[in-house]
Amino acid sequence: MTRPGVGVAITGSGSAVPSTTLSNDQLSQLVETSDEWIRSRTGIGQRRVAQPQIESLSSLAAAAGQSALEAAGLEATSVDLILLATSTPDDLFGSACQVQAALGATQAVAFDLTAACSGFLFALVTGAQFIRSGAYRTVLVIGADVLSRWTDWSDRRTCVLFGDGAGAVVLQASEIDQLLGFEMRSDGSLNGCLTLAYQADNQSLLSDIEIAQGTYQPVAMNGQEVYRFAVKRVPEILEKTLFHAGIDRQEVDWLLLHQANQRILDAVADRLDISRDRVLSNLVNYGNTSSATIPLVLDEAVKAGKIQSGDLIAASGFGAGLSWGAALFRWGTVV
């Protein structure tokens, strides 16, 4: 429920990617694959990978956040809340506070939100609700992941998919509410389809006390199940969001989907009867950057002049959990 006179507007976007590119041809030196095989099945041509001692999750997130603040014409000290959507923090206790310090956002509360590839969309909705409640007026929402840390580079089923990056948007209180609707869902019964699971070794602490210590396994995925899930659930939730907002799908200017696989993007557009040329995609350059995909492709489209003030955008994130969601918003603001 929106309080009278307190709506939400997206006033700026930003992004950051590592400087190092890993091409499909380079991947063919690691696993049995080829540029043609990867492109034809995923739409991916290359991806970025963070280099140790040069880039970190926190540094990429902070750079994207700073870019978004500059686009919104704001100083970091004006931010009330920082939400960092990530599954690959530099510190398991969370990296949002590191980002807060790097930005100099001394007045902001900061915390991580973990929902894998749905994370940015879930964080966007969470930030909007803080504004609508009247608790905060300016929220910085960042989606960032460094999945190269948790990729099995000997598994061609997964290593061809993932890349590193960060994207961000600024949410501000607005008399005109630009977030027109949202829906979020989770189905834990499908959790095993996409995991980055903790693997423990049992150790005896005392004669009658045993503990488990270990680390995380690389990303594991049942690609066929995830594809079937995405092409069914994503169109459904987008249609529900549009219906509740009273908006026809043909009024949508841009379809902004989690960049998982070009086949999924095309299938969702076809099922919604939305022209593929209205689907934003940068998979060819970055691959699947998890929680960063939506804000990264959004920011590139804004900077390229594709997205104009007043454009209606239907967004959907989906992934591990399994979780999925949709949000409908207009770009450009009156604050």
Curated annotation (Swiss-Prot):
The keyword Transferase is annotated on this UniProt entry: yes
Any single Pfam family the record assigns to this protein: ACP_syn_III
A Gene Ontology molecular function term of the record: 3-oxoacyl-[acyl-carrier-protein] synthase activity
Cellular component terms (Gene Ontology): cytoplasm
Gene3D superfamilies: 3.40.47.10
CDD domains per the UniProt record, alphabetical: KAS_III
Reaction(s) this enzyme catalyzes, per UniProt: malonyl-[ACP] + acetyl-CoA + H(+) = 3-oxobutanoyl-[ACP] + CO2 + CoA
Coiled coil segments of this chain: none
InterPro entries attached to this UniProt entry: ACP_syn_III_C, ACP_syn_III_N, FabH, Thiolase-like
GO process terms (BP): fatty acid biosynthetic process
Keyword terms, alphabetized: Acyltransferase, Cytoplasm, Fatty acid biosynthesis, Fatty acid metabolism, Lipid biosynthesis, Lipid metabolism, Multifunctional enzyme, Transferase
Pathway assigned in UniProt: Lipid metabolism; fatty acid biosynthesis
Keyword DNA-binding: no
Annotated spans, ACP-binding: 259-263
Cellular localization per UniProt: Cytoplasm
Catalytic activity, EC: 2.3.1.180
Positions annotated as active site in the UniProt record: 117, 258, 288
PANTHER family assigned: 3-OXOACYL-[ACYL-CARRIER-PROTEIN] SYNTHASE, BETA-KETOACYL-[ACYL-CARRIER-PROTEIN] SYNTHASE III, CHLOROPLASTIC
Subunit and partners: Homodimer.
General function of this protein: Catalyzes the condensation reaction of fatty acid synthesis by the addition to an acyl acceptor of two carbons from malonyl-ACP. Catalyzes the first condensation reaction which initiates fatty acid synthesis and may therefore play a role in governing the total rate of fatty acid production. Possesses both acetoacetyl-ACP synthase and acetyl transacylase activities. Its substrate specificity determines the biosynthesis of branched-chain and/or straight-chain of fatty acids.
Assigned protein family: Belongs to the thiolase-like superfamily. FabH family.
Domain description: The last Arg residue of the ACP-binding site is essential for the weak association between ACP/AcpP and FabH.
Protein name: Beta-ketoacyl-[acyl-carrier-protein] synthase III
